[in-house]
């Protein structure tokens, strides 16, 4: 049964949205990390198992470094260091 208020109308439940703490950009935090299309091990963290580039809101990158990651992944794909689609092993 639905809860009812004194006026007889159904009560509205307050829905709380849970926001996780914003991840910091790992490249801004550690200046020794470089984005290079030849470093496949670093680029793997920014690609899903289906071969898609992980969005900024999930990876936690800042806009500048997300653009650099995107370009590095595209370069690595063009010279066959990374797969375009799923089903190809990265090893």
UniProtKB/Swiss-Prot annotation:
It comes from the Bacteria. The keyword Heme does not apply. InterPro entries: Ribosomal_bS18, Ribosomal_bS18_CS, Ribosomal_bS18_sf. The keyword Magnesium does not apply. One of its GO terms (cellular component) is cytosolic small ribosomal subunit. Keywords: Ribonucleoprotein, Ribosomal protein, RNA-binding, rRNA-binding. GO terms for molecular function: small ribosomal subunit rRNA binding; structural constituent of ribosome. One of its GO terms (biological process) is translation. SUPFAM superfamilies: Ribosomal protein S18. Gene3D superfamilies: Ribosomal protein S18. Pfam families: Ribosomal_S18. Binds as a heterodimer with protein bS6 to the central domain of the 16S rRNA, where it helps stabilize the platform of the 30S subunit. Part of the 30S ribosomal subunit. Forms a tight heterodimer with protein bS6. NCBIfam families: S18. Belongs to the bacterial ribosomal protein bS18 family. This is Small ribosomal subunit protein bS18. The gene is rpsR.
């Amino acid at each position: 049964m639905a809860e009812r208020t004194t006026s007889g109308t159904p009560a509205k439940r307050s829905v709380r949205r849970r926001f996780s703490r914003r991840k910091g950009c790992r490249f801004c935090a550690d200046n020794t990390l470089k984005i290079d299309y030849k470093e496949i091990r670093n680029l793997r963290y920014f690609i899903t198992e289906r071969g898609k580039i992980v969005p900024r809101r999930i990876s936690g990158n800042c806009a500048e470094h997300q653009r650099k990651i995107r370009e590095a992944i595209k370069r690595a794909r063009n010279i066959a260091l990374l797969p375009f689609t799923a089903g190809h092993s990265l090893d």
